[in-house]
A protein has these predicted regions:
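Short beta-strand segments
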Residues: 7-41, 47, 55-59, 68-69
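Short, charged N-terminal helix-start/capping segments
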Residues: 40-45, 87, 91
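Acidic-histidine catalytic/liganding microenvironments
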Residues: 52
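Charged, gly/pro-rich active-site loop segments
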Residues: 64-122
Length: 122
C-alpha cells in the first residue's frame, strides 16, 4: 500500500450507548488529516457517532502495514454541501454517487478528524 488513504476500505469503530465497540468496514476518502465516510443515515455507526463523537480507524488489517488512528467525528446531513468530497468518492469508487439515495436511503457524511495515530500514519 502506497499510503493509508489508498486502501479500499477502513475499519471504523464507534461506541454504543453502553460503551461497547461497534466495528465495521467502510469505504472512505481523505483530505489532509480528515477522513470522510458516507453512510446510510439509519446505520448504527451514525446513531453511535451522534451520541459519542469518539471513533477509531484501522487500515490494512493484514498486519503487513497497519495504520490505527483515534479521532472525533461530526455527522453532516447535507452531503450535497460537500461537492469536493462527493467527487473524491466518485473518483475512488468507480463513479459511485453517494447522493443517490435509491439503494440505502438518505446518506450522511461522517467527517473524522484524526487526533492521534497509534500505528503508522500518513
Amino acid at each position: 500500500m502506497r499510503s493509508p488513504v489508498d486502501a479500499p476500505c477502513v475499519w471504523i469503530t464507534t461506541l454504543r450507548a453502553d460503551g461497547s465497540p461497534h466495528t465495521t468496514p467502510v469505504w472512505f476518502v481523505a483530505t489532509g488529516d480528515t477522513f470522510w465516510v458516507a453512510s446510510a443515515a439509519t446505520n448504527v455507526k451514525v446513531r453511535n457517532a451522534l451520541a459519542d463523537d469518539r471513533v477509531s480507524l484501522a487500515i490494512d488489517g493484514s498486519g503487513a502495514d497497519p495504520h490505527v488512528a483515534q479521532g472525533n467525528v461530526v455527522v453532516h446531513h447535507d452531503i450535497a454541501g460537500f461537492p469536493d468530497v462527493v467527487s473524491l468518492f466518485m473518483q475512488k469508487y468507480d463513479g459511485w454517487n453517494l447522493l443517490d439515495a435509491t439503494v440505502d436511503g438518505a446518506r450522511v457524511l461522517l467527517e473524522i478528524s484524526i487526533e492521534r495515530w497509534l500505528l503508522g500514519g500518513p
